Amino acid sequence: SGNTIYFGEGSWLTVV
């Protein structure tokens, strides 16, 4: 939880 992953090209995934 609270983890943010950056995939590049402005794509973000936040795992709550």
Curated annotation (Swiss-Prot):
Quaternary organization: Alpha-beta TR is a heterodimer composed of an alpha and beta chain; disulfide-linked. The alpha-beta TR is associated with the transmembrane signaling CD3 coreceptor proteins to form the TR-CD3 (TcR or TCR). The assembly of alpha-beta TR heterodimers with CD3 occurs in the endoplasmic reticulum where a single alpha-beta TR heterodimer associates with one CD3D-CD3E heterodimer, one CD3G-CD3E heterodimer and one CD247 homodimer forming a stable octameric structure. CD3D-CD3E and CD3G-CD3E heterodimers preferentially associate with TR alpha and TR beta chains, respectively.
Keyword Membrane tagged: yes
Protein name: T cell receptor beta joining 1-3
GO cellular component, one term: T cell receptor complex
Primary role: J region of the variable domain of T cell receptor (TR) beta chain that participates in the antigen recognition. Alpha-beta T cell receptors are antigen specific receptors which are essential to the immune response and are present on the cell surface of T lymphocytes. Recognize peptide-major histocompatibility (MH) (pMH) complexes that are displayed by antigen presenting cells (APC), a prerequisite for efficient T cell adaptive immunity against pathogens.
Key words of the record: Adaptive immunity, Cell membrane, Immunity, Membrane, Receptor, T cell receptor
Any Gene Ontology biological process: adaptive immune response
Subcellular location: Cell membrane
Top-level taxon of the source organism: Eukaryota
Coiled coil: none
Originating gene: TRBJ1-3
